[in-house]
Each structure stands twice: as structure tokens, then as C-alpha cells.
């Protein structure tokens, strides 16, 4: 165990060293650019309002640049995972002594998936995760505190954060709000409910800067209809998009029954015979082999599909927990059941509120699933394979994000593999050492081609990517991001691109590619067809 912990510590140190080394290299001109340029919508109710109202002024005041924000984001993600682990530990320690340091590291490191497969900034996905992690942690801390003043204070903090969540993802807020209300009604004093309702109201009006709660709800409802039902992925509604993608995720999980059987067997072996130790080690190696064979160990965009091992692990652990509960070997208290339900639902409810399918959103919130798995493992009788399951999932976490966390500043191929020569893609690369006229001409051409019905070309500015807005000298009006640019955002934009051009001679270019990585996982037919293979990313990369 000490050897394992030592290796994980070295991995953690190397993570920060390597990330700091390239944190000032390149920028993703899609999601990351949106947050770096502090874009704000003039329309109320959109899910970006929290970032603009709360974090924009802080970034402006401190004049944080891309490197500082990236490192701050990495630290924030890991601290939120650590907080959840710290909150879960005392709750578990009251009933057993099975807590292992590997569990703390496991929960702490899983936010790397969220950080690794999106823009490196604290995006609204990150805000959703951080807020939900803090909310659940505060509620768990409150449930173990006997001091009423501390308990009320923790409930009030969770309520404030829930109100802020209202301005990040409205559907997530609704379901989370209902789950917390039910938890308080059945597991806390009734006075906690009053504290929670008051704190939530204060959180909502703080973010929206509006005391008219009914107007706020109307704005969110209107923006949800406009923003969500845009026909992305071939779906006409959130419900159609979510249910069909969820069906695919579960279908992928249940087609790998051998892994479920292996996990259940590994967790059931209790004896310390040498033969049993050999069997458990063999099963652990089999899990790693199957994960490699099933293409779980991916990088970049393919890392979206790293959720399958967590599905399989959660299914296995929950099944065994029910078995032990039925045999009266373990007993679940009422408040434990509610917290387990919240942790189980959190990856799903945090995924709601965007026009992205659950099959892509679920993996970024696996920290909650990791906490669920750890709690159930600690409740069940200790076995030879108890700590190996989190270790297995932790290895997958590092492997699927190795490329993006340790080597790349943005979501593209490793920088040492990218050249100025066009790659085998529909678009190739747009080199910044070309003439300005040639760059503008190429970008406009790709925009026109991608705007045609049925196009599968990599997009540069389908929704108004800020980087494109600068390159084409603001010659076009863009439907979303472009029209949100103000003096502050354009000055940050121009300063960044100017600095990057000065620091490199001929190695700066826009790398554009069509991502067909989803094809290997298949597609399916339903009332609507979700075209997973049309994921397109335009990236601005600096090769050193």
C-alpha cells in the first residue's frame, strides 16, 4: 500500500509540474475562449450568467492571464474532489474502520476527467460540479454535527450554493433542490428546511441581481427553450436527446457482463489464502486488459467514453450491497440511503441543462460516482479486492487523460505530433504564417461550407467562436458568442493573439479536425437519430 501511495504522490507532483510547464501554451478557441474572454449575454436567464456576474469581475480585478486561470482551475477541481472525500470519511468512520488512503486519493483525482476533456478553464460544467460537490459535502458535514448552530450554518451555506446553481444550470437546480428538500424533511430537523429555503432565495437573487423571483423563473424558462431546443444532434428536445443517449450508455455497459462478474467475484473473496490473493490479482489484471481492449484508455475527445467502467463498477457494487443488505450483513440508515441516492443521481442531474447528450456529459461528473462506490465498499465486508477497484478506476482516470492533462494545453493531438503540414482531415490546418487575406478567406470558406445542411466539415465558427471574430476583422455578425464581445473581451482577445504571434516564428496555426472517434462505438436509430460523429472542434495551438 505504501508503494502505491508513493507512486500516486509522485504522479500528483508530476501533474502540477508538467501542467505548469505548458499552461501558457495555446488556447482552445471554442469553449475555453468563451470563458477567457469573459463573454456575457445581454439576455437574462442563459446558463452563463454566474460566470459573468461572479467570476468575471474577479478575473478582471486580478487581471489573470491564461496560465494563472488554468492553474487555478486545476487546483479548484482537485480541491473540490478532496472536500467531498473529507466529508465522506467521517460519515463512514462512524460505522466501520475500513477507510483506506487510496479512497481519499481516488475521490480527489477523479475531477481530472472533467478538467481533461473540456476547456481548461472553470467552465459552467466545472461550476456545476464544484457547487454540487460543495452542497453535498456541507449536507454530509451537517448530518454528523451535533452542534445545532454548526448544522444550521452548513445547511445555510449549501442553500446559498444551491441558489447560485440556479444561475448555472436551471434543470440541475430544480432536481437538486427537490432531492435536498426530501433529504431535509426525512433526515434533519424541520427548522433546517426554513434555513435552506431562505438561503436558496438569497443565493438566487445574489446571482441574478433581481428580487423578482417570478421574473427570474420566466427568463430561465424562455432561455431554456431558445438555447436548448436548437436541434443539435438531430434531436428536437432535451428529453429525446437525453433518453436516447442514456439508452446507449446503459446498452454499452450491459454488453460487458464479463466485467461485472469479474468485479463481483473480486469483491466477494474474503479469505487471505495465497490462492485467493493470486486469483484477485489475476482478476485485477483482467480488468486492465479488458479496459485496454475495449478502448477505454483513450485521450482527448474519446475520453468522453471512459464512463463505462464506472457504470460497470457501480452496478457491481450496488448489486453486492443489496445482496449483503438482504442477508442482513449490512444495514443502511435512512439518511445514508438519501445521500446514496443523491450521489447516484448527481452525474445525471449535473448533465442536464445543456444541448449535449448525457453520453458525453455523464463522464465529467464521475467524482460523485466514485464517492458512491467508496461508501458502499466501506459498508460491505472487507475483501481482498476492496482497494483494487478504486485503484483500477484511478488508473483509467489517469490513462484517459494522460494526453490532455500531461502533454496538451488544449483538446488536440500531442503538440509534438502536430506539424505545419495539413493532416488527413476535411479542413487540415490554417497556418498563421500565411497571409492575413489567405487566413480570412479560408475561415470564411469553412464557415460557408459548414453552414450547409448535412455538412460534416470541422467548424470554425458555427456559433461565433471569439477567435474567429478577430481573424476575420469582425466582418460578420455571429449568432451567439460574437455578438457578446465587448471592449474588455476584445482587448483580452487581441492581447493574447498578439503575444502568441510575437513568441513564435512559424509555429502558430489553427488546427481544425473532424472528430470521428464516436463512430467506433456505433450509432442507433430511434424516433430521432443522435449523430455522435459530428463532433467538431476548432483549435488554436502554439507548437514550441
Indicate residue ranges for each PLM-predicted region.
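Transmembrane-helix motifs of polytopic, lipid-linked glycan transferases
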Residues: 71-97
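Specific aromatic-rich, kink-prone transmembrane helix
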Residues: 127-147, 154-162, 369-372
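Membrane-interface alpha helices of multi-pass inner-membrane proteins
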Residues: 152-170, 176-182, 199-204, 343-354
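Membrane-lumen/periplasm interface segments of specific transmembrane helices
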Residues: 192-271, 289-295
Amino acid at each position: 500500500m505504501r508503494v502505491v501511495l508513493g507512486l500516486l504522490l509522485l504522479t500528483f507532483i508530476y501533474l502540477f509540474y508538467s501542467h505548469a510547464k505548458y499552461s501558457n501554451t495555446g488556447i482552445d478557441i471554442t469553449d475555453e475562449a468563451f470563458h477567457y474572454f469573459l463573454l456575457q449575454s445581454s439576455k437574462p436567464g442563459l446558463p452563463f450568467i454566474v460566470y459573468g456576474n461572479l467570476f468575471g469581475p474577479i478575473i478582471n480585478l486580478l487581471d489573470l492571464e491564461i496560465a494563472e486561470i488554468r492553474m487555478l482551475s486545476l487546483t479548484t477541481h482537485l480541491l473540490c474532489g478532496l472536500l467531498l472525500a473529507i466529508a465522506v470519511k467521517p460519515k463512514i468512520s462512524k460505522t466501520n474502520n475500513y477507510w483506506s488512503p487510496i479512497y481519499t486519493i481516488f475521490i480527489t483525482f477523479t475531477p481530472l476527467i472533467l478538467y481533461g476533456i473540456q476547456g481548461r478553464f472553470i467552465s459552467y460544467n466545472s461550476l456545476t460540479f464544484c457547487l454540487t460537490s460543495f452542497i453535498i459535502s456541507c449536507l454530509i458535514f451537517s448530518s454528523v454535527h451535533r452542534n445545532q448552530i454548526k448544522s444550521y450554518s452548513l445547511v445555510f451555506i449549501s442553500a446559498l450554493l444551491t441558489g447560485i446553481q440556479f444561475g448555472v444550470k436551471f434543470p440541475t437546480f430544480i432536481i437538486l433542490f427537490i432531492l435536498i428538500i426530501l433529504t431535509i424533511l426525512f433526515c434533519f430537523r424541520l427548522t433546517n428546511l426554513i434555513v435552506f429555503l431562505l438561503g436558496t432565495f438569497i443565493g438566487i437573487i445574489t446571482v441574478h441581481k433581481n428580487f423578482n423571483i417570478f421574473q427570474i423563473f420566466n427568463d430561465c424558462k424562455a432561455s431554456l427553450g431558445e438555447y436548448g431546443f436548437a436541434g443539435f444532434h438531430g434531436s428536437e428536445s432535451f428529453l429525446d436527446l437525453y433518453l436516447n443517449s442514456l439508452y446507449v450508455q446503459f446498452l454499452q455497459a450491459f454488453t460487458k457482463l464479463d466485467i461485472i462478474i469479474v468485479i463481483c467475484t473480486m469483491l466477494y473473496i474474503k479469505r487471505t489464502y495465497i490462492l485467493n490473493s493470486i486469483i484477485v490479482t489475476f482478476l485485477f489484471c483482467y480488468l486492465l486488459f479488458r479496459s485496454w481492449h475495449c478502448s477505454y484508455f483513450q485521450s482527448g475527445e474519446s475520453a468522453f467514453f471512459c464512463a463505462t467502467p464506472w457504470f460497470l463498477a457501480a452496478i457491481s457494487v450496488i448489486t453486492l450491497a443489496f445482496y449483503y443488505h438482504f442477508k442482513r450483513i449490512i444495514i443502511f440508515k435512512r439518511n445514508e440511503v438519501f445521500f446514496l441516492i443523491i450521489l447516484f443521481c448527481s452525474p445525471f442531474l449535473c448533465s442536464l441543462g445543456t444541448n449535449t447528450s448525457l453520453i458525453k456529459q455523464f463522464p465529467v461528473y464521475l467524482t460523485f460516482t466514485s464517492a458512491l462506490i467508496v461508501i458502499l465498499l466501506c459498508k460491505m465486508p472487507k475483501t481482498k479486492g476492496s482497494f483494487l477497484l478504486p485503484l483500477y478506476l484511478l488508473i483509467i482516470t489517469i490513462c484517459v487523460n494522460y494526453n490532455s492533462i500531461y502533454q496538451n494545453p488544449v483538446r488536440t493531438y500531442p503538440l509534438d505530433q502536430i506539424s505545419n503540414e495539413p493532416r488527413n482531415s476535411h479542413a487540415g490546418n490554417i497556418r498563421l504564417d500565411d497571409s492575413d487575406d489567405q487566413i480570412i478567406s479560408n475561415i470564411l470558406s469553412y464557415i460557408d461550407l459548414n453552414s450547409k445542411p448535412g455538412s460534416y466539415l470541422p467548424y470554425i465558427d458555427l456559433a461565433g467562436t471569439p477567435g474567429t471574430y478577430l481573424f476575420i476583422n469582425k466582418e460578420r455578425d455571429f449568432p451567439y458568442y460574437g455578438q457578446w464581445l465587448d471592449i474588455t473581451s476584445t482587448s483580452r482577445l487581441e492581447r493574447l493573439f498578439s503575444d502568441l504571434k510575437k513568441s513564435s516564428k512559424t509555429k502558430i496555426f489553427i488546427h481544425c479536425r473532424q472528430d470521428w472517434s464516436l463512430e467506433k462505438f456505433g450509432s442507433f436509430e430511434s424516433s430521432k437519430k443522435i449523430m455522435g460523429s459530428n463532433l467538431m472542434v476548432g483549435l488554436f495551438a502554439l507548437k514550441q
